[in-house]
Each structure stands twice: as C-alpha cells, then as structure tokens.
Design a protein with these regions (language model features):
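The beta1-alpha1 cofactor-binding region of Rossmann-like NAD(H)/NADP(H)-dependent oxidoreductases
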Residues: 49-60, 92
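Substrate-binding pocket helix/loop in short-chain dehydrogenase/reductase
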Residues: 86-87, 94-96
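Conserved NAD(P)H cofactor-binding loop of Rossmann-fold oxidoreductase domains
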Residues: 78-83
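Catalytic loop of short-chain dehydrogenase/reductase
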Residues: 122-150, 155-156, 160-163
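N-terminal Rossmann NAD(P)H-binding glycine-rich loop of SDR-like oxidoreductase domains
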Residues: 10, 18
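Conserved Rossmann-fold SDR core element
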Residues: 152, 161-177, 212-218
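C-terminal helical subdomain
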Residues: 171, 187-225
C-alpha cells in the first residue's frame, strides 16, 4: 500500500480523492485549511490543517513525514484558490493571493516532500483547461488561469530535473467538474461529471499513470468550460 499526500481535501474532488484512496487501503495524508468530519476516524487517513499560502505552515508536513512516513509514493496537488474579478479590478495583492496557493503552495510542498520521494514516486498536479495555451478562455479569471498555466510549466521542468531519480511529474488539466469552485466561477452551470467520478479517474492515474507518462499534460475535459 502506498503513502499518498493529497491537498485541498476539505471538499469536492480532494475530499473524494482522500476517501477513495483510503478505501483502496492506501495511507493518505489529507491537507486542507479546515478538516472535514467525513475524514475523521478513518484509520487510513491522517489530517493536517495547513494553509498552503503560508510557507511556514508547511513545516507541519515536514514534521509529519520525518516522524511518521519516511517515504512518499505520490502527491496529488489538488488544492486551488479561485478569483472571479475583471482584470481592471484585479490588484497585485489579488494575484499574489491566488499564486500563493496555486503555484507557491505546489512548489513548496514538493520541495518539502523531495527527500521522501523515490524511484517510482508520482507527483500529479491538478491544473485547469484554462491554463492550457490556446484553450478557450473566460473573462474574470486572469489570476486563476495564469496560475494554472504556471504550474504546468513547473511540472514539466521538475520532470526533467528529477528524471534521473525516477520521479515522475505529470499534470491533469481538468475541464468542468460539478464542484463548489465551479459554481463560484460559472454560477448556474451544470457540469457533465461529478467530483466523485473525476476523483476516480485521478486516483487511477496517480497509481498507474507514471508507468506511461512523465512531464506530460493530459487534458481531461468533455466540455467548455
């Protein structure tokens, strides 16, 4: 059974990821700002309250890994922060708040986990179709979509930098999934796929995708958005 870190586990896809991985017998370190009741009491899930926007808060993860796991088989960078605001009203502070979670949080957590990653480990970053060059873009998502483009490039670079160690880095760029975040970005829109359905795909990819992919971006979308 594998040791897997999942971020953004308080709701939506992240919550489903933690539950589905645990149901398969894997050990999950569930990271979110608030800890949901649904994850408490599960013997395969350990929860940490961590704000990815604050680098110092991530020391909790480092402490846990050094004292408990000693090895990380996979990371799913699922946590995300969204801002829906016209570009003309989007300040540098707004951009920074989004990037602190969506980009810096990914980079900092990966760096902390690096000593525990090994040959065969798989780091999966959940991006968005909005971060794909040439994809359909939507007004008001400048900070969010550009941050999702940034982590795509980051993952490609890390795949190259750590290929000799046998650590795989891949990105899943998701289309519309019925989550609270989608409702915030596109009020009233009904997505064709549920959080549980998408989580199942991500779980399968995390466990097996590194056998076939490294440094790749897979577009997981059947609709626009």
């Amino acid at each position: 059974m594998k040791n897997i870190i999942v971020t953004g586990t308080s709701r939506g896809i992240g919550l489903e990821l933690a539950l589905q991985l645990a149901a398969k017998g894997h050990h999950v370190l569930a990271i979110s700002r608030s800890i949901p009741q649904a994850l408490l009491g599960n013997e395969n899930i350990s929860c940490l309250s961590v704000d990815l926007a604050h680098e110092s808060d991530l020391q909790k993860v480092g402490d846990y890994l050094s004292s408990t796991w000693k090895q990380v088989d996979a990371i799913i960078h699922n946590a995300g922060s969204l801002l829906l605001k016209p570009f003309s009203e989007t300040s540098q502070t707004d951009f920074e708040s989004i990037y602190k979670v969506n980009v810096f949080g990914v980079a900092n957590l990966t760096r902390i986990a690096l000593p525990y990653l090994q040959k065969g480990s798989h780091v999966v970053t959940i991006s968005s179709m909005g971060g794909i060059q040439g994809s359909l873009k939507f007004p008001g998502l400048a900070a969010y979509s550009s941050s999702k483009g940034a982590v795509i490039t980051l993952s490609e670079l890390l795949a190259e930098e750590y290929k000799e160690q046998g650590i795989a880095f891949n990105v899943l760029a998701l289309g519309a999934v019925q989550t609270e975040m989608l409702a915030e970005a596109f009020p009233g829109y009904q997505a064709p796929i549920s959080a549980a359905e998408m989580a199942k795909y991500i779980v399968d990819f995390t466990l097996t995708g590194n056998q076939y992919y490294n440094g790749k971006v897979l577009e997981v979308s059947s609709s626009n958005p």
